[in-house]
Amino acid sequence: TDGCEEIILAVQYNAPDKTNYLIGWECFPTKGWGGLNPTQSLVDAFEDSEGAPISKSKIYSEKNPFANRDPRLEVNVLHDGEEMYGVTIKVAPLKSSGSTGIAQHGDATATGYYQQKWLDPSIDPQSAGWEMGKDWVTIRYAEVLLTYAEAKNEVSPLDDSAFEAVNQVRRRVGMPELQKTDATKPTYCATQDDLRQRIRNEWRVEFALEGGKRQWDIRRWGIAKDVLNAPFLGIKYKMVDDAVNADPKDGGKVCVLYEGDNVKLAGSRYEDHNLS
């Protein structure tokens, strides 16, 4: 459907009975609503372009965090300095505009990031019509591959077919293949748990922001309580002196991104989500 061979099951767009709407976002200047905000944890889950987690990367830079990364990061996450709908996104120009230095008002991002996946750049979010005219994808081929890889690794640790299945997903986006033969490379998986954790991360980045799939993953893996009890973090920033560019209300300071401390948002209690 929609001309994509990867789609296995979808809810087809059929106006006026079945429609889908543009996922809005909010930045300065205003263009929509920012109700879905990727967390820092999700942003950090995307590997560097050599296949290393950023915590072990030799090419990752905190001051330029979107450079040399898994290309799916840019597909999923809108960030400061990008252009969308004819405007340049500025997520944190003023401290005085919000308690975290991020939000411009109630509809703005709370984390410093916006959702990019599902945005349709051909639609003006300020126009009268918000319908995307797109089918809603329920199952696509990557889900079949990762389901197989996960299950095969559990019953037959480090099986070649498990590697092949997960690597089909990675090859599609130009990411280095996971492997078990060369310990000098960041893609090396020495144990069943090594491959297990890489497959789990592949689920997260491949299906990021896709209709709540993440909640079923963390339930299946038995880690929901840990994940949902952890604090939500947003982008790193600090306030610096800048008498020329600062708003008087900000005491002569402007916000510089990717330095200082992460924005810490309200936490989430596992029990609030009624998960068992």
PLM regions: where:
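Acidic/polar-rich alpha-helix caps and helix-coil junctions
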Residues: T1-W25, G34-N37, D48-S276
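Nucleotide-sugar donor phosphate/pyrophosphate-binding loop at the beta->alpha transition
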Residues: K31
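C-terminal, active-site-flanking charged/polar segments
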Residues: P38, V43
